[in-house]
């Protein structure tokens, strides 16, 4: 077994509080708390505020990344957390995000990244068919034979 390379969580939060989703400082502090709670190391932070509302905030982590996209008019927040290694706990980060955004409904999807299973799983599974190549070769031979007779 080769093992798992990373954990990727996608979190959809529905029915969040409108005013918090357009507050850059609030979302930034929430993310910083989630990073800390998840035992992750912040390397860089960037955000963009859309007009008339909405945010995209990205945290570059030593272990991966965290992104938050807010849609205030829909009371919706989309979060991605990708981590590698065993020291981080992205599931702990979700608790902080839930406490802050207070969604009415949440959907979390866990994706195992890089889980290839065994070395044989990594080999490409390509089905080769010689029939098309044989047809090209046979057709070429027929054309060549035909052209040779014409002279």
Where is each model-derived feature located?
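Polybasic/polar functional segments that serve as interface/processing modules
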Residues: 1-67, 71-151
